[in-house]
Amino acid sequence: MIIDELEKKVQGKGVRIVFTEGWDPRVQKAAIDLKNNDVVCPVLLGTPEEIAGCAQKNSLNVEGIEQIDPNNFEHMDEMVRKMVELRRGKMDEEKVRTALKSTNYFGTMLVQMGYADGLLGGATYSTADTVRPALQLVKAAPGNKLVSSCFILIKEETQLIMGDCSININPNTDDLVEITMQTAKSARQFGVETKVA
């Protein structure tokens, strides 16, 4: 199964994944499970009060899981400079500092700057709010004109990779070709034999 293949690829390798909603009990439970099984090194974002409050209310033990408070990040000035540079005149320092109060922007910059390997969000944030920072700060992979997404659908023994159900609203013919190629590439990376329909 796709999930098993992904787990094998990252397990025990110290892959750091940022969870933008560290105050959500579902996120905390997932982070605990991933850490206990040495799948990834989860990083919970949020204030100490938010994270501890959620853990206490839900009888969860998040001790030993890295937590980063965007309000007290020691490399914030470096992050602000980098984000101003990436936004190239679209956001000044003041606007960047405001944006970085959002854990979606903050988490995306942690990935962009190499402090984390990936990001998971969307438990409480909308898809648009989760994806927008990545579109603005990470950009498309080299050789690609656009960014697309894919969903993994698993039901019993059936596995499907559905291409771009949420990013490109009205793709033209060329876009559809690129989305198809990107989705097929993602499927192969997951160890799935591709049949494009």
Residue ranges and their predicted role:
Residues 1-197:
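Anion-binding alpha/beta catalytic cores of soluble intermediary-metabolism enzymes, centered on
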